[in-house]
C-alpha cells in the first residue's frame, strides 16, 4: 500500500516556498573586519555582495548623511574565487604575506563625512538588498600639522655620509688584505 504522505505534504511545501521566498531577500554588507582601514579620505572600500549573487546586476547606493540625494553605481557581481572575504590571505611564507582585496571602491567622496551605503542586486527574477550601513571617510589633515621630524633634512645627509665613509674604509681594507696576501 502506497503512502499518501508525500501527496498531502506537497501543498504545504509549496505554500512554505511561496511564503519564505517572496522574491526580495536581505543580506548584510560584511563588517569589514581584518582590514586596517576601509575608509580613506576621499573613498571607501565596501565588501562585495555574497557569492550566490555572482553574475547579478548590482546597484550600489551611496547617500550622504542628512541628505536625500542618492548616488548610484551599477556593476555586475564578479565571480567568487573561494570564500568571499574582504581581505583574504592568498599565500604566506618566508616572511611575506600575499593578500587579495575583494571590495568595491567608492570614490570622489568628501573627507570627514558620514555616508550610508546599501546594495540592491537583481539576479534573474529575484531582487536582494542590503540594509543601509553607515560608513565615514577620514578627515583630511592640514599639511603643516604633520610632524616631519628630520625627514629629508640633515638626518638623511648624515646617514649618507656615514655609509659612504664606511664603504670607502671597507674597500681600502679589502685592497690592503689582498695586497698582503699576494706578498706571502
UniProtKB/Swiss-Prot annotation:
Glycans are attached at residues 28, 57, 66. Keywords: Cell membrane, Cleavage on pair of basic residues, Glycoprotein, Membrane, Signal, Transmembrane, Transmembrane helix. It is a single-pass type I membrane protein. The keyword Signal applies. CDD domains: UP_II. It holds the Pfam family Uroplakin_II. It is found in: Cell membrane. Interacts with uroplakin-1a (UPK1A). Belongs to the uroplakin-2 family. This is Uroplakin-2. It comes from Mus musculus. The gene is Upk2.
